[in-house]
Amino acid sequence: MHPIIEIMSKKSIRFYKDHEVRAVWDEEKSTWWFSIVDIVGAITDSPNPRKYWSVLKTRLKKAGNELTTRCSQLKMAAADGKRYATDCFAQDDIIQLVRVIPSKKTEDFLDWFIYSDNTIDGQSKKKAYTLMESGLLDTLKPGTVKCLQQIHAFLFGGLYDFAGKIRTKTIAKGDTLFCLAEHLHNYLKTVESMPETTFDEIVEKYVEMNAAHPFMEGNGRSTRIWLDLILKKRLKMCVDWSKIDKREYLDAMVASHTDSTRIHELLKGALTDKIDDREIFMKGIDYSYYYEQND
């Protein structure tokens, strides 16, 4: 087994059917390393994936399988916020591991694992990481429509021909009808002029921008970054999105069209003053894109 590696330049959380899969980037080897225990839990639904992996690892060693010799231990953050040494494999070895674990989910998981980065969401998520590291966000004017358009253009440029462009068609999602296209221009001017001095004012502005839904696609991912920029500028705070359950968030956003109480509660409970913590923002991207995944 390789020695414990403590420092990695990038961290990522992927989600397979609501199962969290942690990963860290190895700059020297230009590869992602993935938590083995997370993947075992995702494809086996074992109540104790750590024990499952321990037994499997022993079995593989006894069988002379060289896979275990390529396992590295990396420091990864756990649910309690502390960092623990975690068995990890690089991508090719994860593929081999999954194929030796008996599971009906094998092919579905591999399809997700191998190809999800090539989807529009996968490509956009990479752009979001780059956006966070580029320094561009510091040049934008938080709370403005132009700021939101610039974020959207960066996230979806080259992926959608409407990246950064205000829609000219009326859209709906499920039973929710967003602002009619013919009223959108004036509606956005109204939202932009809304006050953003207090937390409650900022959340109301966010709720109204969600009701506007100014783009054909990619509204939520762009607007959550937009919200964090306002909070950072006005209150020296931001949202730790990993603290907000996906289903609760989505339900609260739907409800916010008539009653925004719950989204206020969720966002307030997830506020943090760690506005310069790179990991908070990167984790925020992971969860923001997870919110958009179909169940």
Enumerate the predicted regions with their spans.
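FIC/Doc superfamily catalytic core
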Residues: 12, 96-295
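An anion-engaging/catalytic patch
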Residues: 2-116
